[in-house]
Amino acid sequence: MNDGFAMNTHSKDERAPENGQAENMAVENGAEAAQAADRATPVSEEDVLLRLAKENEDLKERALRLTAEMENLRKRTQRDVADARVYGIANFARDMLTVSDNLQRALQAVSEEARAQADSGLKALVEGVEMTERAMLATLERHGVKRVDPNGEKFDPHFHQAMFEVPNADVPNNTVVQVVQPGYVIGDRVLRPAMVGVAKGGPKAETPAATSEQAAQGPEGA
């Protein structure tokens, strides 16, 4: 009896691989049949042309995007190189302005009377300091650093720093009437704003009342 049970079990084990192979063959046959059906389906020339046209349009869009990205990268690189060339010495130039200020203070410490009465040694020293300052400023200017001396100009908060106000009836309001310390720029960037005194309330400045009256009169009233 045990022998019969073993034979039945063995028979089932032998049939299991056969069933799996049959299922695999069925799947493969189904896939081949589907592919054959696809090949058998006729594709019109119009469909082919439409598909090719769409692919061509997609390629054009990708090419345009790539061209635009490359152009933007080229412009950005050029701008970065130009900025590095112009502004690369900004920190160094700012530090050198302190040296120039000290030279100027040294010159201001020697009065005109003292210079007139000075011996040849002191005169030579003063002239040497003046030449050094001029050479330093000329070198900075060759590298794009420009001096801002706005005396008599309208106050501009982008380039000037107001230190005090001066009542002055002879000039328009917000006119720079005194430069305490000149400013410097490099390119369109401010290295140091000019420290200035600004006029307050001159009669040449148009009053709000007069402006309002002229606006109310219009062109005919003017």
From Swiss-Prot:
Cellular component aspect of the GO annotation: cytoplasm
GO molecular function, one term: protein homodimerization activity
Chain coiled-coil ranges: none
Record carries keyword Cytoplasm: yes
Region (Disordered) residue spans: 1-21, 200-222
Tree of life domain: Bacteria
Full protein name: Protein GrpE
Origin species: Chelativorans sp. (strain BNC1)
Phylogenetic classification of the source organism: Bacteria, Pseudomonadati, Pseudomonadota, Alphaproteobacteria, Hyphomicrobiales
Gene, per the UniProt record: grpE
